Amino acid sequence: MAYSRLVRSLGSLLGRQHPHKMGVTRDMVVALLRYKPKNLVEFRNKLATCTLCIGCMRPGEGAQATSCNLQFDSDFLKGLPAYKDCSSLVVNKRKQDQERKGHWMRFGKSTDPELDLNFQLGLFMDLALTRPSPACAAHQLRGKRCLTCPPLFPKLHKGPGGAWTLHPDPVPSPACVSAMVTAALRMIGVDTAAFSGVCCRMGGLTVATEAGVPETILWMQSGHAQDRAARRYVRLTNPDRLYDTWRAFRL
C-alpha cells in the first residue's frame, strides 16, 4: 500500500506518459464488414466501429447520432442519379466547428455487396426496430439531438424471451460507444490493448491522408485540419469530392 501511494504521488508530480494508441486500419474495417455477427450486439458493435472509422468520428459523436441522422439516398433524392444507394450521416455538432454547424459524411455504394455499409446499417435498423419515428422533428431542432428517434447505435439488453432488444434508456454514452469499438475489434482477433474509441477517428484520418484526400475535403468531412480562410467560402457544385474519404477505404 505504501509503495502504491508513493507511485501515485510521483505520478501526480511527474506526470504519466500518454498510452500509445493505434488507428483502426482499412483491413480491420473490411474484416468487420465481412464478419457474420452471432447476435444483434455484435452487429451493432461492428457497424459502430466501421461507421466511426470511415466517418472519422469521435465516440461522443457516435453516441449522439440518431437513426434520423442517417439519410439514405440523400444525394439521389436531390436529383443526382449517380448516387443511388448511397447515404449521408449528419453529425449535428463537431468539436471546433467553424463557419458551419455539423458535417454530412458520405458513404457510397460498395462494388462488393458484403462490404456495403449502407445495406448493413439499414438491415440493423430493421432488426433492432430503430428506423426513424414518423413523429421525427429533427429538422426543427437546428443542430440539436433528435429526442424522438432511436439512437443509431443504441444500448441493448436481453428481453423476457432472451432476445436482444432496445434498452429502456437506449442512448449510449461516449464510453459505451468506445466499448463497442474494442468489443468489435476483439471479434476479429485484434489485441485491443492499444485501441479505444478514438482510434476510429485516428484510423479514418490516416487512411484518407495516405490515399491523398486533400485537407480541404477532410476539413469539410471531419472538421480536421488547420483552418484556412478560403475554405469558409467554398460551395461545392456537386457532392462527389465529399465521397473521397469513403473512397479511400476502397470498399
Go through each PLM region and give its residues.
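Extended, non-catalytic subsegments within catalytic or DNA/protein-binding/adaptor domains
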Residues: 1-251
